[in-house]
Amino acid sequence: MRRIKVIFFDLDDTLVDTSKLAEVARKNAIENMIRHGMPVDFDTAYNELLELIKEYGSNFPYHFDYLLRRLDLEYNPKWVAAGVIAYHNTKFTYLREVPGARKTLLRLKKEGYMTGIITDGNPIKQWEKILRLELDDFFEHVMISDFEGVKKPHPKIFKKALKAFNVKPEEAIMVGDRLYSDIYGAKNVGMKTVWFKYGKYAELDLEYKEYADYVITELPQLLEVLERENGSDKEVHSSG
C-alpha cells in the first residue's frame, strides 16, 4: 500500500519562478519612473527600493509612494503610476512556471496522488500567479498564510493542510525551496520533507538542512523520491 498520499508544494520558486521575475520587474519599474521624469539616477533609486522592500516586505502596497519620500522628492502620482504599470506589465509578461513543474504535476495526478499548496504571502497575489499559469485544477486545497492568519514555519498552517486532506503527517510530503519555513516547519509536524534547492534561497538557512529528508535540484526528481518512499529501492539523484 502507498505510504505517501499527499504532496504539498510551496509556490514561489518551487512551482512559480518568481525570484528572477521580481528583480526584472523592479528594475523596469524604476526605469519607467525615470523615463517619465523622476529626477534620480537608476542606481540610487533601485538601491533605495531594495532597502524599502527589505524593511517593509515584498507585499507592502506602497513601495513606489514611499520611494519618493525616501528620495526626498515631492509626491507625483504620474511617477508612481509609471512604476506600478511597468512592474505589473513585466510580471504578467514574464510569469513562468519553474522548469518541469507542469510535467511533474501531470504525472502526480496520473498516478493518483493528491496535491496541495502551502504558501506565505498575499492571497490575491498568490492566487493571481496560480490562475494566470492555469495551475489551479491540479490542487484540491491551497493554504495561503495571510488568509489563514499564520505563517510558515508555524505548525498550525501545516496541521490545517493535513486536516483538509484527512491524512496523517507521515502520509504527506512537503516540497519547498526554503529550509526554515518549508522544510523545518513541515518536519516539526512529522511530515516527510523535500528541499528543492532552487532560486535565491538555495544557499540560505543551511543550518536547517538536517531537516530535509531529500534534496532535489529539478522538480521531476520528486518522482524518484516518491518511488523510494513507496517501496522502490531506486536512489534519488540530485545534480547539486
Swiss-Prot record:
The prosthetic group or cofactor this protein requires is:
Mg(2+)
Q: Which domain of life is it from?
A: Archaea
Query: What keyword terms does UniProt attach to this protein?
Result: Hydrolase, Magnesium, Metal-binding
MF-aspect GO terms: metal ion binding; phosphatase activity
GO BP terms: namely: small molecule biosynthetic process
EC id: 3.1.3.-
SUPFAM superfamilies assigned to the protein according to its UniProt record, in alphabetical order: HAD-like (SSF56784)
The record's section on Pfam families has:
Hydrolase
InterPro entries from the UniProt entry? HAD-like_hydrolase (IPR051400), HAD-like_sf (IPR036412), HAD-SF_hydro_IA (IPR006439), HAD-SF_hydro_IA_CTE7 (IPR011950), HAD-SF_hydro_IIIA (IPR006549), HAD_sf (IPR023214)
Free-text function comment from the UniProt entry: Catalyzes the dephosphorylation of D,L-glyceraldehyde 3-phosphate in vitro.
Q: Which family does it belong to?
A: Belongs to the HAD-like hydrolase superfamily.
Q: What is this protein called?
A: Glyceraldehyde 3-phosphate phosphatase
The record lists the organism as Pyrococcus furiosus (strain ATCC 43587 / DSM 3638 / JCM 8422 / Vc1)
